[in-house]
C-alpha cells in the first residue's frame, strides 16, 4: 500500500507507533519497523542521553528499517537533560 506517509517515511504500511512511556524500547520499535510500520523509541523512558544513545544503537542492530524517537517536553521542576537528548537524536540520525 502506498500513501503519502509510506513514501515520506520509507515504510511499507501507514502505521506509526506512538511513543509509549515505560514500554518504548528498542525491542518494540524494531518489531514495528520490521513489520513494515514506523517503530518509535520513547526518549524520556531511557532517562539519560547516554542510555538513549545505547537504545538507538540497539534498535539499529535489530532492524535496518526506519524508526523514530519520540521526545515529549513536559513541565517539570527538575527537567531531564532535554538538550542532551536532542543532541543524541540528531547525532544518531534518527
Locate the predicted segments by residue.
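Active-site entrance/lid segments in N-terminal catalytic domains of soluble metabolic enzymes
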Residues: 1-94
Amino acid at each position: 500500500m502506498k500513501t503519502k506517509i509510506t513514501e515520506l517515511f520509507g515504510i511499507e504500511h501507514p502505521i506509526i507507533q506512538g511513543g509509549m512511556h515505560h514500554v518504548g524500547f528498542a525491542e518494540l520499535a524494531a518489531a514495528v519497523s520490521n513489520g513494515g510500520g514506523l517503530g518509535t523509541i520513547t526518549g524520556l523512558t531511557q532517562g539519560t542521553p547516554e542510555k538513549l544513545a545505547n537504545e538507538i544503537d540497539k534498535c539499529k542492530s535489530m532492524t535496518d528499517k526506519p524508526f523514530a524517537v519520540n521526545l515529549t517536553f513536559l513541565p517539570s521542576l527538575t527537567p531531564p537533560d532535554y538538550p542532551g537528548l536532542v543532541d543524541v537524536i540528531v547525532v544518531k540520525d534518527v
